[in-house]
Amino acid sequence: EFDKYRREKKQHPIMEKYGVNAIHYYHNELDIWRQNFQGVRVEFMGTDIEVFGAVDDLWIYENGDIIVVDYKSTSKSVNNLFHSINDFNDVWEGGKIYKRQLEVYQWILFKKGFQVSNDCYLVYANAYKDKQEFNNILDFEVTLLKHVGDFSWVEGVLIDIYKLLNSNEVPESSSNCELCGYVEYSNRLFL
């Protein structure tokens, strides 16, 4: 339904409801940018590291700033009762991973030469679980969560990744890394 409003160059009702003075952005590559394994992509400073992601949507303010938008859906409840999603504190781990995802998308678009807004949004659809019968239909409460992004951290992380990939030393595993524990356990079993 968001694309319908994009074609009409009109605000989606959720934008009006939350006071976002923007419309859907159109770019001739948007359909490619939205595809998994295609996405919007940029090479990082001649390193052969390509950073990409499939953006869900882009909006645009009147001043030309592009707004990154991502869609999430879940069915969140507390004590088996429906729980409204009102801000990032209601999202898994305070939405930290979603905020980082939005900021990486902002950075990619910035590196591609776009005028990118610090504002970014999650359109968060939360399915009601307390219905007696679903009848093959899920009803959702849809909330718009705003995040003021800061992608200044992205290049530092990419530099660290590049250095690690070009190093002859293997870093120590971390107790905070689930995959590290799995690999360590597998190595003990099979080596």
Positions of predicted regions on the chain:
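A non-catalytic, helix-rich entry segment at domain boundaries
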Residues: 1-40, 44
